[in-house]
C-alpha cells in the first residue's frame, strides 16, 4: 500500500529519507515524490524513476552517511502537544491560579521542559510531584493562561492590561523568554504619558534593561516632562539620578531648581529629601541675579544648613573667576557628556591670513561646527586645558615666519557659556613655543620673539592670575614639542641656534630642575608630542635636507619613561609639521600643519592607533591651516552648536 502524507503546503514539510523502506515492487507515493521534488533535488536524483531506482540507491549508499534535519519538526511536535492539551488528552497534572478556581490541564513534561520552576517541582522530590492538582499562589489567572499558551504555542500576546499579570507569572515561574518579550514590549511602548509607570514596573520586577532605558528616555525628554507635569510623579531615586546626570539636555539650572521645588511641595514628606536633591543642582552655574531673585527667596534654602552651604559655595565660586579652573567639582562642571576634538587658529594656505576660528568635530555627522571665535586671530600659539577651561597663550596674530610679531596676551575659553575672557599676559612675548598644563599650573617653555630665541620658562598660577619665571632651559629652543607624564614635563627636539635637535629634557616642578633623558633617534622640529598610557609619542615634524632646505620627517617613535628608551613605530602617511595634536579615546589625532615635501599647508587629519600601530587618514579640516592647535574639550552636544561653513571661516588679515 503506498505511503501517504496529508499536507497542504509541501514547502513547510521535510521528512528524513532514511526511515523510508521501499523495493522495486513497492511503488513510491506520488505525494512523496512531489515533496522531494520541491525540497531536495539531490534526493530526486537518488530516488529517480522506478526504472533506474536500484542504481541510484546504490550510488547513494556508496557515499558517506548524510544527516537530514526537518526545520518544521519542532513546530509540528509543539502543535501536536497543544492539540492534545486542547482535547484534554494525556494531560497528567492540573494547574490552578492563586486568585481563582480555574483549572488548566497540562502535561508535566511540557511544563518542566520550559520552566526551571516546574522542572524542580516535578523532578526534585517535592510533594507536588505526586499531586494531580496544584494551586499556584502568587500567579493570577491571566498570568497563568499567558504562560501556558506560550509554552504550548511559542506565541505571546501582550497589552498594557495584561502586562503586569504576565510579568508576575513569568518572574515567579522563571519563564525567561516571556520576561524578554515583556522587556521588549515595555521599551517599545515608552511615552511621555507612561514613562513613570513603566519605570515603576521595571523597578518592581528588577528589569535592569528597561530601567536603564527609562532613565535614558527621561533624561532626553525631561524638558517635555516639565511642561506636562509628569515629572511630579517620578520617585525620589529617579529624580535624583536625573538631576545628577551630565546627559540631561535642554534644561537650565534655574529650570531644574524650580522643578525640584514643585516636586518637593507636592507632598509634605518629600521635604525631608530637599537637601539631598539640591546637592544635584549646579548653583555655581546660575547667574548672581538668578541666585538672588529665585533661589535665596525660597525658605528652606535659607534655613537648611546644607542648602545654605550650597549657596555659599556658589557665591565664592563666582567671586573668583580666575581660580575657577582649579575649583572644579561636580556642581561646577558643564552639564554635558559630549567630549569632542577641538581645533583653533592657524594660518590659511592661500591668503596667508590668520584664523580666530574655534571648531569642534562631530563624528556622527562628519561636520565641523563653530564655537565662539577667539577675540584675536592666532597661530603658532600654545594651548592647554585645566578643569575643562581652554587657555590660548601667546603666538602671533600676523603671518611672520621669523616670529617678530609674537604676542604675550592670554585668553581663556569657557565651554559652559561659550565665552572668552582675557587673563594675565606673559612676561615675555612668545611664539613657536610649547605650553603644558601640569598640576593645575601652565608652563610656557622657550620659543622666540623679535629679540631672538628664548631659553626662559614661565609658570601661570590661576589662583593668583600671575605668570612667574621658573628654571630656564640650558639652551634656547623653539619649534620643540612637549607633553606631561607622572607629574613632570618632557620637552623634545626643536631648533637651537638654527640647528635641529634630538634631545629629550625633563622638568620637575617640585624641584624646579631640568634633567637630560635618552635622546630621540631622529632630529626633528615643529613636530608634536603626546602621552597615551605610559608612552610618550613623538610624531612628524621636519629637519634639514642638506644645508638650506627642509624635509618632512615621516618616522615616529615613543619614549618609555620607565626604561628611558625610545622605540620606533609606524611612519605617518603624509608629512605634517607645526600641527595640532590631541588624544581622543586613546587614539592620536594629528591635525593640519605644513608639508615641506609638498610646500603647502595641509587640511589632512591623520589618526594613529597605538594598539594596532596603524595610521589612517580620517577626515579633513574645512581649509588648509598651518600653525593650528588642537585638544579635546567637553562641550554641549553638537546639535546645539553652529555648523561651520567649509570655506567661510571668520579670519583676520595681517
UniProtKB/Swiss-Prot annotation:
Kelch repeats lie at residues 340-388, 389-440, 441-487, 489-534, 536-586, 587-635. InterPro entries: BACK, BTB-kelch_protein, BTB/POZ_dom, Kelch-typ_b-propeller, Kelch_1, SKP1/BTB/POZ_sf. Pathway: Protein modification; protein ubiquitination. It comes from the Eukaryota. GO terms for molecular function: ubiquitin-protein transferase activity. Keywords: Cell cycle, Cell division, Kelch repeat, Mitosis, Repeat, Ubl conjugation pathway. Component of the BCR(KLHL9-KLHL13) E3 ubiquitin ligase complex, at least composed of CUL3, KLHL9, KLHL13 and RBX1. Interacts with AURKB. Substrate-specific adapter of a BCR (BTB-CUL3-RBX1) E3 ubiquitin-protein ligase complex required for mitotic progression and cytokinesis. The BCR(KLHL9-KLHL13) E3 ubiquitin ligase complex mediates the ubiquitination of AURKB and controls the dynamic behavior of AURKB on mitotic chromosomes and thereby coordinates faithful mitotic progression and completion of cytokinesis. This is Kelch-like protein 13. It comes from Mus musculus (Mouse).
